[in-house]
Protein backbone atom coordinates (compact mmCIF):
# COMPACT_ATOMS: atom_id res chain seq x y z
CA UNK A 1 0.00 0.00 0.00
CA UNK A 2 1.35 3.41 -0.96
CA UNK A 3 1.85 6.23 1.56
CA UNK A 4 -0.96 8.58 0.54
CA UNK A 5 0.35 11.38 2.78
CA UNK A 6 3.01 12.00 0.14
CA UNK A 7 0.59 11.94 -2.78
CA UNK A 8 -0.54 14.84 -4.91
CA UNK A 9 -4.27 15.52 -4.96
CA UNK A 10 -6.17 15.05 -8.22
CA UNK A 11 -9.63 14.83 -9.72
CA UNK A 12 -10.58 12.90 -12.84
CA UNK A 13 -13.33 13.67 -15.34
CA UNK A 14 -14.85 11.08 -17.69
CA UNK A 15 -13.12 8.37 -15.67
CA UNK A 16 -14.78 5.39 -17.40
CA UNK A 17 -13.94 2.21 -15.52
CA UNK A 18 -10.88 3.77 -13.93
CA UNK A 19 -7.96 2.66 -16.09
CA UNK A 20 -6.28 6.06 -16.35
CA UNK A 21 -7.12 6.78 -12.72
CA UNK A 22 -5.45 3.56 -11.59
CA UNK A 23 -2.30 4.35 -13.54
CA UNK A 24 -2.12 7.83 -12.05
CA UNK A 25 -2.80 6.40 -8.59
CA UNK A 26 0.18 4.09 -9.04
CA UNK A 27 2.23 7.09 -10.19
CA UNK A 28 1.57 8.86 -6.88
CA UNK A 29 -1.70 10.76 -7.23
CA UNK A 30 -4.54 10.55 -4.74
CA UNK A 31 -7.94 11.04 -6.36
CA UNK A 32 -10.21 13.39 -4.45
CA UNK A 33 -13.08 12.69 -6.85
CA UNK A 34 -13.79 10.71 -10.01
CA UNK A 35 -16.68 11.77 -12.25
CA UNK A 36 -18.40 9.57 -14.81
CA UNK A 37 -21.80 9.81 -16.50
CA UNK A 38 -22.21 6.11 -17.36
CA UNK A 39 -23.83 4.09 -14.56
CA UNK A 40 -22.31 0.75 -15.58
CA UNK A 41 -18.81 2.21 -15.47
CA UNK A 42 -19.43 3.67 -12.02
CA UNK A 43 -20.86 0.36 -10.81
CA UNK A 44 -17.77 -1.42 -12.13
CA UNK A 45 -15.44 0.79 -10.10
CA UNK A 46 -17.60 0.50 -6.99
CA UNK A 47 -17.60 -3.30 -7.34
CA UNK A 48 -13.80 -3.28 -7.52
CA UNK A 49 -13.67 -1.10 -4.41
CA UNK A 50 -16.03 -3.47 -2.60
CA UNK A 51 -13.87 -6.41 -3.67
CA UNK A 52 -10.94 -4.84 -1.86
CA UNK A 53 -8.61 -4.16 -4.76
CA UNK A 54 -5.44 -2.52 -3.51
CA UNK A 55 -5.05 1.25 -3.76
CA UNK A 56 -8.62 2.27 -4.65
CA UNK A 57 -10.46 1.92 -1.34
CA UNK A 58 -10.57 5.69 -0.83
CA UNK A 59 -11.82 6.57 -4.32
CA UNK A 60 -14.91 8.79 -4.33
CA UNK A 61 -16.84 7.97 -7.51
CA UNK A 62 -19.69 10.25 -8.61
CA UNK A 63 -22.14 9.37 -11.36
CA UNK A 64 -22.48 12.89 -12.73
CA UNK A 65 -22.80 14.91 -15.89
CA UNK A 66 -19.63 17.01 -15.78
CA UNK A 67 -21.61 19.97 -17.09
CA UNK A 68 -23.31 20.12 -13.68
CA UNK A 69 -20.17 19.69 -11.57
CA UNK A 70 -19.18 22.63 -9.36
CA UNK A 71 -15.51 23.14 -8.60
CA UNK A 72 -16.11 25.71 -5.87
CA UNK A 73 -13.50 25.50 -3.15
CA UNK A 74 -11.04 23.41 -5.15
CA UNK A 75 -8.80 26.19 -6.45
CA UNK A 76 -5.35 25.77 -4.99
CA UNK A 77 -6.22 22.40 -3.46
CA UNK A 78 -5.90 20.13 -6.51
CA UNK A 79 -2.55 19.40 -8.12
CA UNK A 80 -3.82 17.65 -11.24
CA UNK A 81 -6.91 17.20 -13.40
CA UNK A 82 -7.07 14.19 -15.70
CA UNK A 83 -9.59 12.51 -17.94
CA UNK A 84 -10.59 11.12 -21.29
CA UNK A 85 -13.37 13.23 -22.86
CA UNK A 86 -15.83 11.20 -24.99
CA UNK A 87 -14.14 10.12 -28.20
CA UNK A 88 -17.22 9.80 -30.45
CA UNK A 89 -16.95 13.36 -31.87
CA UNK A 90 -13.49 12.46 -33.24
CA UNK A 91 -13.56 8.68 -33.65
CA UNK A 92 -12.91 7.11 -37.05
CA UNK A 93 -16.06 5.06 -36.51
CA UNK A 94 -18.30 7.98 -35.61
CA UNK A 95 -19.86 10.89 -37.48
CA UNK A 96 -16.85 13.06 -36.60
CA UNK A 97 -18.72 16.30 -35.98
CA UNK A 98 -16.25 17.63 -33.40
CA UNK A 99 -17.55 20.90 -31.90
CA UNK A 100 -20.98 20.36 -33.45
CA UNK A 101 -21.38 17.04 -31.63
CA UNK A 102 -23.21 17.53 -28.33
CA UNK A 103 -20.95 14.85 -26.85
CA UNK A 104 -17.87 17.02 -27.31
CA UNK A 105 -16.80 17.58 -23.70
CA UNK A 106 -13.51 19.37 -24.29
CA UNK A 107 -15.23 22.66 -23.34
CA UNK A 108 -15.90 21.08 -19.94
CA UNK A 109 -12.29 19.98 -19.61
CA UNK A 110 -11.26 23.58 -20.27
CA UNK A 111 -13.80 24.86 -17.71
CA UNK A 112 -12.40 22.52 -15.08
CA UNK A 113 -8.86 23.75 -15.72
CA UNK A 114 -10.01 27.38 -15.63
CA UNK A 115 -11.92 27.04 -12.35
CA UNK A 116 -9.52 24.75 -10.47
CA UNK A 117 -6.19 26.01 -11.86
CA UNK A 118 -4.29 22.77 -11.18
CA UNK A 119 -0.52 22.60 -11.47
CA UNK A 120 -0.84 20.05 -14.25
CA UNK A 121 -3.52 18.41 -16.39
CA UNK A 122 -3.55 15.37 -18.64
CA UNK A 123 -6.26 14.47 -21.15
CA UNK A 124 -6.34 11.62 -23.64
CA UNK A 125 -8.41 10.91 -26.73
CA UNK A 126 -8.44 8.89 -29.94
CA UNK A 127 -5.89 9.46 -32.69
CA UNK A 128 -8.72 10.63 -34.96
CA UNK A 129 -8.41 13.95 -33.14
CA UNK A 130 -5.26 14.56 -35.22
CA UNK A 131 -7.00 14.13 -38.57
CA UNK A 132 -6.49 16.95 -41.05
CA UNK A 133 -10.21 17.72 -41.03
CA UNK A 134 -9.94 18.50 -37.29
CA UNK A 135 -6.68 20.46 -37.44
CA UNK A 136 -8.24 23.86 -36.77
CA UNK A 137 -10.45 22.56 -33.99
CA UNK A 138 -7.59 20.65 -32.39
CA UNK A 139 -5.47 23.81 -32.40
CA UNK A 140 -8.46 25.54 -30.79
CA UNK A 141 -8.49 22.96 -27.99
CA UNK A 142 -4.77 23.48 -27.39
CA UNK A 143 -5.15 27.27 -27.37
CA UNK A 144 -8.03 27.09 -24.90
CA UNK A 145 -5.98 24.92 -22.57
CA UNK A 146 -3.03 27.29 -22.94
CA UNK A 147 -5.17 30.33 -22.08
CA UNK A 148 -8.14 28.95 -20.10
CA UNK A 149 -9.00 32.35 -18.63
CA UNK A 150 -9.97 33.75 -22.04
CA UNK A 151 -13.59 32.62 -22.10
CA UNK A 152 -15.59 32.46 -25.32
CA UNK A 153 -18.14 35.31 -25.20
CA UNK A 154 -21.80 34.53 -25.68
CA UNK A 155 -22.66 34.51 -29.37
CA UNK A 156 -19.08 34.17 -30.59
CA UNK A 157 -18.35 31.16 -32.81
CA UNK A 158 -15.52 28.80 -31.93
CA UNK A 159 -13.73 29.92 -35.10
CA UNK A 160 -13.87 33.55 -33.95
CA UNK A 161 -12.73 32.58 -30.48
CA UNK A 162 -9.86 30.61 -31.96
CA UNK A 163 -8.76 33.70 -33.89
CA UNK A 164 -8.89 35.75 -30.68
CA UNK A 165 -6.80 33.17 -28.82
CA UNK A 166 -4.32 32.98 -31.69
CA UNK A 167 -3.88 36.76 -31.56
CA UNK A 168 -3.19 36.60 -27.83
CA UNK A 169 -0.77 33.74 -28.35
CA UNK A 170 1.10 35.54 -31.11
CA UNK A 171 1.38 38.83 -29.24
CA UNK A 172 1.92 37.16 -25.83
CA UNK A 173 -0.15 39.87 -24.21
CA UNK A 174 -2.04 37.52 -21.92
CA UNK A 175 0.42 36.27 -19.33
CA UNK A 176 -1.83 35.17 -16.46
CA UNK A 177 -3.31 31.73 -16.10
CA UNK A 178 -1.16 30.35 -18.91
CA UNK A 179 -0.17 26.72 -19.32
CA UNK A 180 2.65 25.15 -21.26
CA UNK A 181 0.82 22.53 -23.31
CA UNK A 182 2.28 19.65 -25.30
CA UNK A 183 0.72 16.65 -27.00
CA UNK A 184 1.92 13.32 -28.35
CA UNK A 185 0.42 10.39 -30.22
CA UNK A 186 1.32 7.32 -28.15
CA UNK A 187 0.82 3.60 -28.65
CA UNK A 188 0.07 1.57 -25.52
CA UNK A 189 1.97 -1.36 -27.05
CA UNK A 190 5.18 0.63 -26.62
CA UNK A 191 4.60 0.70 -22.86
CA UNK A 192 4.04 -2.96 -22.11
CA UNK A 193 0.34 -3.28 -22.98
CA UNK A 194 -0.43 -6.29 -25.26
CA UNK A 195 -2.67 -4.17 -27.47
CA UNK A 196 -2.25 -1.73 -30.36
CA UNK A 197 -4.01 1.24 -28.81
CA UNK A 198 -3.13 4.69 -30.13
CA UNK A 199 -4.09 7.70 -28.08
CA UNK A 200 -3.45 11.43 -28.26
CA UNK A 201 -2.18 12.54 -24.86
CA UNK A 202 -2.36 16.25 -23.99
CA UNK A 203 -0.35 17.47 -20.99
CA UNK A 204 -0.22 20.99 -19.59
CA UNK A 205 1.89 22.53 -16.83
CA UNK A 206 0.93 25.81 -15.19
CA UNK A 207 3.60 28.37 -16.09
CA UNK A 208 4.55 29.07 -12.48
CA UNK A 209 5.39 25.39 -11.94
CA UNK A 210 9.08 24.62 -12.26
Describe these PLM feature segments.
Residues 6-10:
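Extreme N-terminal starter segment of soluble prokaryotic enzymes
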Residues 11, 32-33:
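Conserved beta-strand positions in the Rossmann-like core of class I SAM-dependent methyltransferases
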Residues 13-18:
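Class I SAM-dependent methyltransferase "Motif I" SAM/SAH-binding loop
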Residues 19, 44, 105-108:
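Well-ordered alpha-helical segments embedded in enzymatic catalytic cores
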Residues 23-30:
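A short, Lys/Arg-enriched amphipathic alpha-helix followed by its capping loop at the start of a domain
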Residues 35, 43-75:
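S-adenosyl-L-methionine
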Residues 38:
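Conserved SAM/SAH-binding beta-strand->alpha-helix loop
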Residues 71-78, 90-210:
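Class I S-adenosyl-L-methionine
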Amino acid sequence: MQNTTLMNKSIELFCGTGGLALGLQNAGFQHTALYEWDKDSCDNIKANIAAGFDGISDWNVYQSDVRTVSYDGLTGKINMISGGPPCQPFSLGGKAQAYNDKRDMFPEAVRAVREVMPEVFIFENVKGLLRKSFSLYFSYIILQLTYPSIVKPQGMTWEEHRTLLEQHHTSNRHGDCEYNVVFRLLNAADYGVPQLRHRVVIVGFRKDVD
